[in-house]
């Protein structure tokens, strides 16, 4: 009985298991990626912070879960993922995340489209 009360308490507090739902066109990338950041600044290798976490999350989702870890540091793995995403979506693979890369990532994330394969 005590275990049942503990489980009920955890579920009521929001620690229950959630199921994955499909993203709708109204779902923003920041909602899909835990709300790390809503700003989309120019990013490049060695940057860090919440905007990098948002980038990493969108890359992770857009590259069929083969993107970088979401750690907030734009290191070699993030650079490689950015360049792969840019190549796959027809952008110059310069590793710099600017307005065009953000726009492609946002579209990919917000539409709930199939991950990029190339």
UniProtKB/Swiss-Prot annotation:
It holds the Pfam family PG_binding_1. It comes from the Bacteria. This is Uncharacterized protein in bpoA1 3'region. It comes from Kitasatospora aureofaciens. The lineage of its organism: Bacteria, Bacillati, Actinomycetota, Actinomycetes, Kitasatosporales.
